[in-house]
Amino acid sequence: LPVAERQENHPDIRPRLLKQNRDNAPLQERKYGIDSKLRPYFMTLRNCKNVYIKGITMMNSPMWNIHPLMSENIIIDSVTIISPNNSPNTDGINPESSKNIIIKNSVISVGDDCIAIKSGRNNDGRKRDMPSENILIKNCTFANGHGGIVIGSELSGGVRNVLIEDCDMSSPNLLRALRIKSNEYRGAYVENIIMRNTKIDTIGGPIVGINMDYKSYETEKTDKKHYTSCNNILVENIECNFANQGWLINGSEKLPIENITFKNWDVKNIKYGIHHKNIKRLLLENINLEAEGAMARLT
């Protein structure tokens, strides 16, 4: 279980195949017992700077694959991450409270989020007060997963300045291309998110899903609410052959989403049209959606 802590100017992590489900490992090499309940991350970078990971293949992780935590200046290049479609919590790459991250030329197909950007959960994230910011995701391919690019739901330190460009996505088991999720306990902000030049063959859910009332198991519920502000989202230059839905956006009544722009979409076939509510300033420009059923529900 590779864990790097407080490493700087780390040499390349060079090409190799890493698998985490080896059978019959000698007892002295086992990290967790067969009946243990804790599923370990595959690779964690904690408080690290200037790390370059290139050309590795990671398979069958029991939990998140690559987890940069409170780290900066990380490049992840030409990485392949594969986990079964039905394997829970096997996120591909999860930058958390990290900045200046580049993820490029990589292939991810997993049982949960392909890339999930986080910054801590509830009080832990607020006390840490370290956003994830300045993240570039470029020229990547996503297949199975709950989302291609996901922000949240653990974002209580904030997420800002994310650029996703020139990516390909295709699988009926990929449930969203871009997803943002939070709830009334997370707080903080999501702002300045751009996704552009995305090619999608088939996707099993909406191209964009934003949910500010995401219901997850909460252990820190209090009477005090912490609403998340979500501002300045641009999704442009989208080519798609089939999507289950164009977009599904549920903003918060208490703090509506502001400034969403969808521009230059060409979607050949969608099943359920579009739905959105609780948005201030939604701009649609040059949007072509060819729907089978009801086209729109706007509230």
Question: Language model features by range: what are they?
Answer:
Residues 1-299:
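Extracellular/periplasmic carbohydrate-active domains that bind, remodel
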